[in-house]
């Protein structure tokens, strides 16, 4: 079995780690960074940029630069959270034919898993460059509070990126693995508070060690899949926009370029205010009107930022209470608090969490890397590289079906350890009913339509009988990824119907296969583009060095030779403006051939100085050819 890499596919940043011998190693990407911005850009010339290169050009290409895609994955367009994001994002969120939230880039509709796959491909390539081998398997993390549709969509993204997703694990659980594996912690109960770029989770986890085997058992989990650093940024952006409007009478919300600059500045200011008491947001030439250019210069204090976001931080505390209650624990029974996610660097967040638990959170876990490290550990467990670790995760939400009167009847309660299987017998509501519809739901509300609909299917061919007589056994089976399989069986006839729940939304197999093919085609296009760039660089270098030599010794060349070199230079220069690699390489070869005369002209010429011929000839024996470098006098 090859390496199974661990990927933290984050809202704001992503990270990849591997088991390297006995150690877990977080890998640096091609830019030399250990985390990669989860930003994807589609340029005018058809190139796809991922990470820092995408982030750098965001200001000039806001409509085609996509970020925070994780907030849309597995969601419906009409969802309240999606509608809220749709009003503030510079890119276009649209409804797919099946009602999912998709994105529109350059007049083309794209699914969130298809876009997230570009980030996963970069993570895959980072690991392949480090290991020198092809990677096909991964463990990918998701927020603990992700529902079935969001988990399925994440697996789809992995497939599109060319990865077999061996396991989906919850981010707080992964962080607990990273924390607990390399420490002699003994038996402990910990709380993992995970506030990332777009999602929030809290998990209560018990770590037990028996005869050298560590068991990580999740007792309870809770959270909010639409609360994170992006929301903190948006509070700051709205404040800056409102202040600018007060001063200048101009609403920047109508200017996508200005909003993109403002987003970057707001995020930077938020980060600075974690260590400083105040900062200046200074954006010259933010916009212009008939009276001339407008400049934005606003001073923001830490106290001001905290007043803007305090309600968001408080929102994260309610799930803490519910998780503790579900685990049957009091605050005093939590021995360690682990902070995960970049937003937990904010002093206000740290203070509120410390006040809630009555103890300071641990500072020895890297909030940006812990989740990827835990994913790599789980990959090591699956491949056999890591021994004596058992992970017992839970289903975050109750699962059930709609029964008579529009009631949700739960078959599997929230915080049930997975994998798990549960069956229950139901019956018909009408006399001689020949079919039943099994409507699968996820959530905690009593009314069926208040919960998340995961899909429905029919069991027909039920033998005619008075209502309440037929016995229909419904079985829910959750696998280790937290993905649900449902079957319904008529116990009288033995007739059975099974489905793996693909939410009524989601990508179908044909769409996934098409996206996989597109991704493979893109990989080939990327390779060709890289080769074209290499040829261009080689051509540019040759142009520069040949011109330099021509300046130095061109006067020693015959007129015909000089003309031939000039023509070859022009031909190469013209080829470099095109997209044809073969043409560029041919013109490089042509220039190399004709510029041989330049090389000859730059060598010492015996017999060229008339009277000094004999002396030159005698000295020639002692001459050693050497490379030289022109040193220009400093002025």
From Swiss-Prot:
Q: What Gene Ontology terms describe what this protein does at the molecular function level? A: ATP binding; ATP-dependent protein folding chaperone; unfolded protein binding
* Keyword vocabulary terms for this entry: ATP-binding, Chaperone, Nucleotide-binding, Phosphoprotein, Stress response
Q: Name one Pfam family in it.
A: HSP70
PROSITE patterns from the UniProt entry = HSP70_1, HSP70_2, HSP70_3
- The answer to whether the entry has keyword Lipid biosynthesis is no
The keyword rRNA-binding belongs to this UniProt entry's keyword annotation: no
What induces this one?
Answer: By stress conditions e.g. heat shock.
Cross-referenced HAMAP family: DnaK (MF_00332)
Which family does the similarity line name? Belongs to the heat shock protein 70 family.
Which NCBIfam families is this protein grouped with? PRK00290.1, PRK05183.1, prok_dnaK
Q: What is this protein called?
A: Chaperone protein DnaK
Species, as recorded: Pectobacterium atrosepticum (strain SCRI 1043 / ATCC BAA-672)
Upper lineage: Bacteria, Pseudomonadati, Pseudomonadota, Gammaproteobacteria, Enterobacterales
Its gene is dnaK
């Amino acid at each position: 079995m090859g390496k199974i890499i661990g990927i933290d596919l984050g809202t704001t940043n992503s990270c990849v780690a591997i088991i390297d011998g006995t150690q877990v190693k977080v890998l640096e990407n091609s830019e030399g960074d250990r985390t990669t911005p989860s930003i994807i850009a589609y340029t005018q010339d058809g190139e796809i940029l991922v990470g820092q290169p995408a982030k750098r050009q965001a200001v000039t290409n806001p409509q085609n630069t996509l970020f925070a895609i994780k907030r849309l994955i597995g969601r419906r367009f009409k969802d309240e959270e999606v509608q809220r994001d749709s009003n503030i994002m510079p890119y276009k969120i649209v409804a797919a034919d099946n009602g999912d939230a998709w994105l529109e880039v350059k007049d083309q509709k794209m699914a969130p898993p298809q876009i997230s796959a570009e980030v996963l491909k970069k993570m895959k390539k980072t690991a392949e460059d480090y290991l020198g081998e092809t990677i096909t398997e991964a463990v990918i993390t998701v927020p603990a509070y992700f529902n079935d549709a969001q988990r399925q969509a994440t697996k789809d993204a992995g497939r599109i990126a060319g990865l077999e997703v061996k396991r989906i694990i919850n981010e707080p659980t992964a962080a607990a693995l990273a924390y607990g594996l390399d420490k002699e912690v003994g038996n402990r109960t910990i709380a993992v508070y995970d506030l990332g770029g777009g999602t929030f989770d809290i998990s209560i986890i018990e770590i037990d060690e028996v005869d050298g085997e560590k068991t990580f058992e999740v007792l309870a989990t809770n959270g909010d899949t639409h609360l994170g650093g992006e929301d903190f940024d948006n509070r700051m952006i709205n404040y800056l926009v409102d202040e600018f409007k007060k001063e200048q009478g101009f609403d920047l919300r109508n200017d996508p370029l200005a909003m993109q600059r403002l987003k970057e500045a707001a995020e930077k200011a938020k980060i600075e205010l974690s260590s400083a008491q105040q900062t200046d947001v200074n954006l010259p030439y933010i916009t212009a009107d008939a009276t001339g250019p407008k400049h934005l210069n606003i001073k923001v204090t830490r106290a001001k930022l905290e007043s803007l976001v305090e309600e968001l931080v408080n929102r994260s505390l309610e799930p803490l209470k519910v998780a503790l209650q579900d685990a049957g624990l009091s605050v005093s029974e939590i021995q360690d608090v682990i902070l995960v996610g970049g937003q937990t660097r904010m002093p206000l967040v740290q203070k509120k969490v410390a006040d809630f638990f009555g103890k300071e959170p641990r500072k020895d876990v890297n909030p940006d890397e812990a989740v990827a490290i835990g994913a790599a550990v789980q990959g090591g467990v699956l491949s056999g590289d890591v021994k004596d670790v058992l992970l017992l995760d839970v289903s975050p939400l109750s699962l059930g079906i709609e029964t008579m009167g529009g009631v949700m009847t739960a078959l599997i309660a929230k915080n049930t350890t997975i994998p798990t299987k549960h069956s229950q017998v139901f019956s018909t509501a009408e006399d001689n009913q020949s079919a039943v519809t099994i409507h699968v739901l996820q959530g905690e509300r009593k009314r069926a339509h208040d919960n998340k609909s995961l899909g429905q299917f029919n069991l027909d061919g039920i033998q005619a009988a008075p209502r309440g007589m037929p016995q229909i056994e419904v079985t829910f089976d959750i696998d280790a990824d937290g993905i649900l399989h449902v079957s319904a069986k008529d116990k009288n006839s033995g007739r059975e119907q099974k489905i793996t729940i693909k939410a009524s939304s989601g990508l179908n197999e044909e769409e996934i296969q098409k996206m996989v093919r597109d991704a493979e085609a893109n990989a080939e296009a990327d390779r060709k583009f890289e080769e074209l760039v290499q040829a261009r660089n080689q051509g540019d270098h040759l142009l520069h060095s040949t011109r330099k030599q021509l300046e130095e010794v061109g006067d020693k060349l015959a007129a015909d030779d000089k003309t031939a070199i000039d023509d070859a230079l022009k031909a190469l220069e013209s080829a470099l403006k095109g997209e044809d690699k073969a043409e560029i390489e041919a013109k490089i070869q042509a220039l190399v051939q004709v510029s041989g005369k330049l090389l000859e002209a730059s060598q010492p010429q015996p017999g060229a100085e008339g009277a000094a011929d004999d002396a030159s000839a005698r000295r020639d024996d002692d001459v050693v050819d050497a490379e030289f470098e022109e040193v220009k006098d400093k002025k």
